[in-house]
Structure formats: structure tokens, C-alpha cells
Amino acid sequence: MAQGEKITVSNGVLNVPNNPIIPFIEGDGTGPDIWNAASKVLEAAVEKAYKGEKKITWKEVYAGEKAYNKTGEWLPAETLDVIREYFIAIKGPLTTPVGGGIRSLNVALRQELDLFVCLRPVRYFTGVPSPVKRPEDTDMVIFRENTEDIYAGIEYAKGSEEVQKLISFLQNELNVNKIRFPETSGIGIKPVSEEGTSRLVRAAIDYAIEHGRKSVTLVHKGNIMKFTEGAFKNWGYELAEKEYGDKVFTWAQYDRIAEEQGKDAANKAQSEAEAAGKIIIKDSIADIFLQQILTRPNEFDVVATMNLNGDYISDALAAQVGGIGIAPGANINYETGHAIFEATHGTAPKYAGLDKVNPSSVILSGVLLLEHLGWNEAADLVIKSMEKTIASKVVTYDFARLMDGATEVKCSEFGEELIKNMD
């Protein structure tokens, strides 16, 4: 097979050769350990699924400490250029630089490449230790908006010239008198746009249609923040009705029917929509949602939410099924085709080089990558092997200490077990 070819995109669709070149960022701390295990598992799955007809050619690019030590930069322009050119990449955890400049390398990558969806599927693998009674009821896919909200990075420190100007403008030009302690306040700005909302909700509904999911829930705090989070909810409903028509039934439609014809008619309309296989578009206030994912998780399927809510929700849900050590993630621009698949946990520097930590997060992010390429046969091999390996209680230390009768293995050995269990 040839040395490797570039993935291309035409009309928003990936053209994937049989031997795609995929850039990878090894990651800091435990990054080399987990990448060593994960890359072998992904390669073995592709080999087994396609018997040598398909193969990934990895291309290393640099970010984080490794980049800084090599180039003096935490996120070299060359790395961004390579990912732009090759479209798809996978990365381990990165250290956030101490001091000024880039606040978070992960956020910088998302913003530079406009990766507007943070995709976080949450599902349970039988046998994984969980703090909840029925973790198997949790099966959701989170679409978190990645570029806006309070995480946009528009923030000014207490006492700075910028914050003084901003507070003065708010007080004098807009007659704002709600800043309780203006002399000692830092200020952050929360932009939420109709375009940003629309492309996120569109991606979530498209995913629900493509994967046979039953509902999309818009999670927000619009009861308090009416013109940002409330607008997110309203724009989401408007987009669903305008672009998807009879493929969906929204709670906004439900409310209109209830107002005009009564609740019985609205309930009947929703039941008929469900029976017809339409996707129900609904909403939930964030604090109530965080209760209900514990008390009735099987009522939720695909979730679309803003940046800050999505951060909380993704990690809270991950805890219900075993923690972020086994939580995959991807950052995707569904319009340009660019995507970075990533470990969702930190660098855990105290375990660096010990061949100890659980590589499942980056392995399962690799599964998302394979699915994104359309290589579902290889992705399924990894999932089934993960199910089999965990069910047999052969696990890394983080799970072994919480499981009766477990066999504790190293990071690399867990990868080897996964390869053995592929069938």
C-alpha cells in the first residue's frame, strides 16, 4: 500500500482514501503512555476489519510541552496548518501554559479551527464501577457549543483599565446599576449568537436522524438569562421547525397546540409524532436537567447545549458511567470537515512514564475518529473488545481498586488485551 494520502473534503463531505494520513499530538504527562497503547489498538482494529486493505498513516505534530521544548511555542502555527490541511487529527491531554498568552491549548485549538461542536457520547460498559444504581440507563450524546458563551475568553481583571472602561460604559451609557461591587469586579462577556446556535442544533438533529435517536434536548438557563440562553432555546426550536419540518415535533409546537386546542390535543399530537418516528425536540432548564440525568436518564438521548453548561453536563454524565478515564470526546466543524478527537482527561503528570493510567478515553475517541471516517467495522471491533475486556475484569488500576476480583494490568497491557479480544 502507498505511504499515505490526504483526506479531502468536497461539498462538506469527507473523501477518505484507504490509507489516510492522520496527524496526532501525543500529549503531555501520561500522553505518551496512553498514545502508545491507543495507536496499537486502532491499528489492530483496522487491520483485522479490512485485512490490510485499509491502513492509517500517523503523522506527528506538536503542541504543549513537547512543542515548547522543541520550538519555544506551546501551539506552533505549523501544527494548526497541518491540521487544516489534513482535516482530521487525534490528541492526548495537553498542559495549559502557566502565565500569560494562551489560557488553554484545547480552547485555542477549538477557536483557531472553529471546531464548533464538542461531541461527548456517554454510555455504560458492563462491569465498570459506577456510583449510580442503574448506570446502563445512561446513553446520551452531548453536543456542546465550543466557540461562544462565557468561554469565549472576553474577560477583564479587577482594577484593569479595560474593566474600568467597560463598567463606566455600562453605568453611564446603558444605565446599568446592577453591578453590586463595581470597584472590585472582574467582568466577563457572554456572547450567544443565532448563527452559533443554529449550526450546533442543526448538527445535533442531523446526528439524531442519522443514528436513529429519539429526541434532542436543548439545555439552558433561559429562565434567568433570557436574551442569551433563552434565545438559544428559541432559536433552536425555530431552526428545527424551519429546516426539518415533518421529521421533528417540537415542544414549541406542543405549547401552541395546547394553547389553541387544549393539553389533550397536544399530548395526542406528540404521541402520534413519536409513533411516526419523528424526533422530539424538547428543552430542559440546566439545574433540573442535572437532577433528572440522575433520576431518569433514559428520558434523554441527544443533548444540545451551550459551552459552560456543556462542560458541567459532560463531566457529570461521565461520572455516572465510570468517569472521564473512559469518556471519549471530539471537536468537530461539520461544515468544513475539520475534526480533532481527544482524551477528555488531564495530563496526570505524577503518573507520567509509569505505564499505569487507563487509555480508554483516547481509545474510544479513536473509535469516534473511525466512525467519522466511515470505518464502522473497525470501530465496532474496538467497542466489542472493550465490552469483553472490562466484563472479564481485566482493567487498569483506576477500575481495579473499585472492582471485586479484578486483574490489574498496565496501560500497555490493557491495550494488548483489547487486541487479543478482537473477534
Curated annotation (Swiss-Prot):
PROSITE patterns: IDH_IMDH. InterPro entries: IsoCit/isopropylmalate_DH_CS, Isocitrate_DH_NADP_dimer_prok, IsoPropMal-DH-like_dom. It catalyses: D-threo-isocitrate + NADP(+) = 2-oxoglutarate + CO2 + NADPH. Pfam families: Iso_dh (PF00180). Disulfide bonds: none annotated. Keywords: Glyoxylate bypass, Magnesium, Manganese, Metal-binding, NADP, Oxidoreductase, Tricarboxylic acid cycle. Binds 1 Mg(2+) or Mn(2+) ion per subunit. The record marks Y151, K221 as: Critical for catalysis. Homodimer. This is Isocitrate dehydrogenase [NADP]. The lineage of its organism: Bacteria, Bacillati, Bacillota, Bacilli, Bacillales. The gene is icd.
